[in-house]
């Protein structure tokens, strides 16, 4: 039976957290500056996390704290300190992969979600984790039919356990992220969140024959780089099996968080009101505006032993849209909802702009009205200050970006 599903969005800082909540996330997941799987993201100070939790709770939303790296003996005191802080800060759950950390979190009364790093691929393993966790984040390597079986068997065994699954974002070439390539090549530990992603580089594949000769099989291709996951075309099926939809992207910017959250929120709501299929093409087009390596459905409809869809020919970002910084807000007049923007790039009526700031989050606007010296203009030039009528509240110092489609 289809039920309302939670939408869980990523945040690498306060700007992303506020953006996610403003655009419809039910919950946000984030990390402190230690012991989480995105060590290279901005991440939160303790003070920022407290502020973010307050913002979420004031809006009846939740915050989940990632503490899901490999935990070594010398990490144990730090783990205890982080869990104590999480408890006092009133986080809504901790995302954990280490069993000892789960037990400690249980003793503190913290709600636990078993991380995707736990590699839960069957109902027996899920049932085991239900002793420690209220939710498991299922392995990305499962098919939709396998997930259905897991859910049915848990229900049959009367196991009270929520299931969370990824619906959008980057995929790892290794099983649930357990990769040693970054560590081997650069001494940067992927399983402690410090991956340098050598899989995203171009590689040369050479075959050595028995006679000692070499043959270049493939050169300058993205052999190890999977396409990004995008399940926007399968929301109704996924709502049948998951309690929570997770958007990957704790290393991504606020505009990515804004658009993915907005579209998946609208998609979920449209399934419930019956308008999903009418809006599907719009959803797909909007998701092409964010950074992507071309889209795929991951393992949901593919056997793990069959061929996979990799990036191969695509040079980095497959999106046809680019974000260009064009100015900053120097004043905002609340009564008339007009932002005064100092430009270092031309701006014209009909352009789509993004305005991003720590308190503002990320907002998108289509420019419909501009004035210079109280006179309407169609185009504002680089170096000018222009008043732009907006639908959102923005703030002095916010950065302004032009969203431009490339040919």
From Swiss-Prot:
Say which enzyme class the record assigns. hydrolase
A GO biological-process term: proteolysis
SUPFAM superfamilies according to UniProt: Translation proteins (SSF50447)
Annotated EC = 3.4.-.-
> Which molecular function GO terms apply here?
peptidase activity
Task: State the Pfam families in the record.
Answer: Peptidase_U32
Coiled-coil region(s): none
Alphabetically ordered keywords of this record? Hydrolase, Protease
Q: Which domain of life is it from?
A: Archaea
Family of this protein: Belongs to the peptidase U32 family.
Tell me the protein's name: Uncharacterized protease MJ0090
Species of origin? Methanocaldococcus jannaschii (strain ATCC 43067 / DSM 2661 / JAL-1 / JCM 10045 / NBRC 100440)
Supply the source organism's classification.
Archaea, Methanobacteriati, Methanobacteriota, Methanomada group, Methanococci
